[in-house]
């Protein structure tokens, strides 16, 4: 066991050029090719990478980016969505870009976005 630990330390201490030379010597002596194993790993990694984008985001943030020309309707929409008071809703609209709601479902985010767009505001769902 001590021999393996010592061998490991020696291999880890090799420079890249020495490690590449060691690989070539081991390939010829053992009759294997390290290059043949690499595509298998890449193909497996590619499958895992392709599976990751399939996961859908479950929580969204709705951000009011611009109030538009009809601020009154936008303030009303903010009050409906957030149940804020009149002053707080006005401050939110005047301070755009501001987060209107966080951690909402995809359907709720789409509903909120539609409501704000109908009121004349520009909204971004993140």
Curated annotation (Swiss-Prot):
Q: Report the CDD domains cross-referenced here.
A: Ribosomal_L7_L12
Entry's PANTHER family?
39S RIBOSOMAL PROTEIN L12, LARGE RIBOSOMAL SUBUNIT PROTEIN BL12M
What high-level taxonomic lineage is stated for the organism? Bacteria, Pseudomonadati, Acidobacteriota, Terriglobia, Terriglobales
Originating organism: Koribacter versatilis (strain Ellin345)
Quaternary structure, per UniProt, is: Homodimer. Part of the ribosomal stalk of the 50S ribosomal subunit. Forms a multimeric L10(L12)X complex, where L10 forms an elongated spine to which 2 to 4 L12 dimers bind in a sequential fashion. Binds GTP-bound translation factors.
Q: What is this protein called?
A: Large ribosomal subunit protein bL12
Could you tell me the gene encoding this protein?
rplL
Which keywords does this chain's UniProt record carry? Ribonucleoprotein, Ribosomal protein
Which family does the similarity line name? Belongs to the bacterial ribosomal protein bL12 family.
- Mind telling me which Gene3D superfamilies this protein's record contains? 3.30.1390.10, Single helix bin
Keyword Ribonucleoprotein in record: yes
> InterPro entries, per this entry?
Ribosomal_bL12, Ribosomal_bL12_C, Ribosomal_bL12_C/ClpS-like, Ribosomal_bL12_oligo, Ribosomal_bL12_oligo_N_sf
Q: Which GO terms describe its biological process?
A: translation
Instruction: Briefly state the protein's biological role.
Output: Forms part of the ribosomal stalk which helps the ribosome interact with GTP-bound translation factors. Is thus essential for accurate translation.
- Give an example GO molecular function: mRNA binding
